[in-house]
Structures are given as C-alpha cells and as structure tokens.
Amino acid sequence: MSGKIQDGVAIRRMSDAILFFTNYTSRNLIDQRDITLSTLHTIRRNLGTCWSIALLNCWNETSSHAGVMRFILDIAFSLRFGDFTMLGACGNVDPFDDAGQIFLKSCKATGRNDSCFLTPSDNFGYYLVSFLNKEQLKCVVDMNVGIHNIEDIYVTRMESIMEFIYYYYTESGRDVVNWLEKLESADAGLAAHAKSKRLMRAEIDLIRREILERTRLFINSNRNSFHDHHRELVRRYRTIWADVISDGDVAEETSTEATTSAQHSTALSAELDEVDEYDHPNDGLLTFRREEDAASNLDSLLGSLSGEDAFQG
C-alpha cells in the first residue's frame, strides 16, 4: 500500500478525475452546470491537496488533456466571481503519500500506457507545475475576509489563468512536435485511450482555435460591461493578447458576431466528432445531462458553489 488510504480506494479516486476530464467538453461548466459542479466537488473533496497533481497528470495524458484545457477555458471566460475557486484545493486533507504513483496505477487500471502522455519542454513543464500549485493555494478564498473583496481576487486570479492560456497557445504552436514525441505515428492499432500524433495534433489545433475565438468573443462582449471588474478583466486580457489579437480584430466585430460564433462552434464540434471517430469507445465513462441554467443573480456572481467547495473558512 503506497498511500495513506488503501491503494484500491486511492486508484478509484484518481480514476474519477481522469474520467471526468476525458468526458469534459467545451461549456460543460455552463451548459451542464449542476451535474458538472456536483461531480467536480466530489472529486476535489476526495483528492484534497492532491488536486493540482491530478490536474497536472490529466493535462499530460492524451485522452484527458483537452478536457483539462477546456475546463480551464470555461473558468477563464466565466463572469461568475467564484468560478476561479475550482482550481483551488477543497480542504486540507492529503490522502496520498505519492499521488504521482497513484496516478500511474490508475492509468494502468484504465488501459493507459507510456504512449498516452505528452512531453512538453522543460520550461513549459516547470511553468505548468508552478501555475497549478500556485492556483491551488491562491484560488482558495477565506470566508471570513475574502468574500468581501472577491471581485478583486477574481480579476487577479483570472489574469493569472489567462496568462497560462496565452503561454499554452504560444508554446503549443511553436513546440507541438516535441510535445507529441512519445505518441504513436499510426492511427490504427492504438491502445485504448491512446491518440496518434496526427489525432492529438488535430485536437491541440482545435483547442488553439477555440482559445482565439472565445477570447475575441469575451473581449467584445464585455468591453462595455456595466460591471467595472469585468471591464478591467477585458483590459487585462487585451494586454495579454496584444501581440496576437489587435484592436482592429476587436473593433471589426459587429452585431452578427453571435451568429458567426455559433457557426464556428458548430464547425468545431463537427471536427471534434470527426477526430473522435478514430478513438476507442470509453466504456463506463461519466455522462453528463444537459441542465437548464436558471441561477439567480447572486448565484451568477458567486459561481453557484457550496461553502466548503468555493471558500475555505
């Protein structure tokens, strides 16, 4: 037994995180909010302070990589002031002595092997670890003091998250060949959950395109927001993306943007479906039901999280 709890229980808890992100698609946090939050809360509570390690390993694993990135994107483009707390640890429990070892055992238990992992550069790898560890600590809000200035914390943390997304965008465009070095070249004969270099590159390209489209949409939709913190966030996002998204790109957006964005989203979904046709079916994975998002104004601001999930007192 390598952990503080029995290995079987530890492996199951880590496997839940892998399966959650394997199934996660764009806007789950918005369109399927209730079931997503409920599942996520259970996973974070079970992982405790190993949450950042789980995120790191799921990011590196090919079948869950896109889910982690789209989860982070959903947080980065959320107008709810409490959603950033989902990157923070839920509680102070440290359930595993060696979370990395438990993750590897979970991968073996679900049919994943060495050909299922990305190999980012050392610089990006260090940045990723630092980012996740930092957010695990700083995204926790003290109920006694933090709730009174959560809007300011929201802007600061969202800026940090967007800086990571920007770095991901630039590095994945520059160094993607090395990221895919360990993956199989052929599409046929892959192990369950594995992705070939071609399929994984196509998926990363889709994520990069989604990053640009959603960033432009967020900036254009909220630059004249009635809420000054949202306007400040737009200003910071524009600064981060200044060398990629020009003022002209934003200024040229018109009232038809929503229709155009919907068309792009449909096209992205179609391309993802085409990519997924090559993947092996994932039996027993979590499925999400679509829920009507009928949150109140306060719920919209604070992120509809329970007390122990969003904040730490």
From Swiss-Prot:
Single GO cellular component term: host cell cytoplasm
Record lineage: Viruses, Riboviria, Orthornavirae, Duplornaviricota, Resentoviricetes
InterPro entries registered for this protein in UniProt: Phyto_Pns9_10 (IPR008776)
Family: Belongs to the phytoreovirus minor outer capsid protein P9 family.
Keyword Transferase: no
Chief localization: virion
Function according to Swiss-Prot or TrEMBL: Minor outer capsid protein.
Family annotation (Pfam families): Phyto_Pns9_10
Compartments where found: Virion; Host cytoplasm
Alphabetical keyword list: Capsid protein, Host cytoplasm, Outer capsid protein, Virion
Region forming the signal peptide: none
Name of the protein this chain belongs to: Minor outer capsid protein P9
